[in-house]
Amino acid sequence: LDFHTSENLENIGADFNKKEFCRALRAGHVNSITLFSKCHHGWSYHPTKVNEMHPHLDFDLIGAQIEAAHEAGVRAVVYISAGLDEKYAVAHRGQVIRKSDESTIWATDFMQPNYHRLCMNTPYLDFLLAQIKEMLENYDADGLFLDIAAVETCYCESCMNTLIGEGKDPENLREVTALAEHVYENYTRRVREVVD
C-alpha cells in the first residue's frame, strides 16, 4: 500500500475494517504486503514515542494491518520513508541535502512545493534510526523497506564541515562524492546495527 498523507487530510483510516482487509488479502492471493510506518510527510501511522502519529489518525493502523496480514498468512513488510520527512525537513532546514549553489534537490527551495531530501550526515540519521528501532521492537514485521536512500553529493553545513575538517576541498567533486559514498556506507552500517 502506498500513501503519503498530509496533515491537512482528515479521518485517516476511519473506515478501516480489519476483517475486510484480511478477507481482501486472501481473495487477492497476496503473499506479501508493504505497510506504512512513516510517509514522506513525516507522520507515523501508529502510536510512537520517537516521532508523531498522524494528527488525524486515532488508532494503531499499522498494528491492525500487520495483525490482519498475519491472520491471512501474508508477510507484512514495514515501509519507512528514510530520505524524506517533510515535517522534519521544515523544522531542520539545515539538515536538508544541498547542491553546491545551496539550493535543495527535488525542490529548489522551501517556497516551491515538493519534498526535501534529508542528509544522513546530520542528526537526522539518529532520529531515523530511533524510528526503525521503535518499529522493530514494537511490531512483528517480516521485513523492512527503507525508501529514498542513495548516494547523493551534498553541500549542507554538516558535509562542508566534515570535508574541511578532514582537510578536503569542497570544490573538488571527487572528494565531495567520496564523502557522499562514506555517508551512505555509514547509514547502511548503522541501520544494520539496529536491525541485527
Regions found by a protein language model. Name each.
Residues 1, 33-35, 76-80, 144-146:
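Hydrophobic faces of well-ordered beta-strands that scaffold small-molecule active sites
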Residues 1-8:
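An acidic-aromatic substrate-binding cleft motif
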Residues 117-196:
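Active-site neighborhood of glycoside hydrolase catalytic domains
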Residues 3, 37-39, 148-150:
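Short, small-residue-rich loop/turn micro-motifs
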Residues 29-31, 70-76, 140-142, 196:
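Short, well-ordered coil/turn segments that N-cap beta-strands
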